[in-house]
Design a protein with these regions (language model features):
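Solvent-exposed soluble domains appended to multi-pass membrane proteins
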Residues: 1-116
Length: 116
C-alpha cells in the first residue's frame, strides 16, 4: 500500500475467485479484504467474478455485498476514510519487533540454562 496514505481515499480488490469453486476460499478472501480496510482505515471495494463482491467501511463493517455465484451490481456512496491507524503508520515493524524480542528471550534463557 502506498505509504502516502493522505492521497488514498479507498482500497480496491479485483479478483478471480472462480478457481476456488464453492470452497471456503472466497469467504477467506472477502474477510482478508475486511482486515485490510480496518488496518488502513480506508473503505474497500471488492469485485470478484464468481466470488463475493462488496463494499466495506473502514471499521470492517459490510455496507453491501453480492453473495457467491450471484451476478449483480452495487451502487453505494463512498464511505469516508478515518484517521490514520496505528498499523498504517508502523506496518509490520510491530510484528518483526515481537519476533526479535521473542528470539532474544529464547537466546538468553538457553544461555542461562547452559551455565547452570
Amino acid at each position: 500500500i502506498n505509504p502516502k496514505k493522505d492521497k488514498l481515499d479507498f482500497l480496491v480488490n479485483l479478483t478471480n475467485d472462480a478457481w476456488f469453486g464453492k470452497s471456503s476460499g472466497p469467504y477467506q478472501h472477502f474477510t482478508a479484504t475486511r482486515f485490510r480496510a480496518v488496518e488502513q482505515g480506508l473503505p474497500a471495494f471488492r469485485s470478484a467474478n464468481t466470488g463475493i463482491s462488496g463494499i466495506i467501511d473502514p471499521y470492517g463493517r459490510v455496507i453491501n455485498k453480492i453473495n457467491l455465484d450471484v451476478s449483480g451490481a452495487i451502487f453505494s456512496p463512498l464511505p469516508k476514510k478515518i484517521k490514520e491507524t496505528y498499523y498504517s503508520k508502523v506496518g509490520d515493524l510491530l510484528f518483526f519487533g515481537v519476533i526479535i524480542i521473542t528470539l532474544l528471550i529464547m537466546f538468553f534463557i538457553k544461555k542461562k540454562k547452559k551455565y547452570e
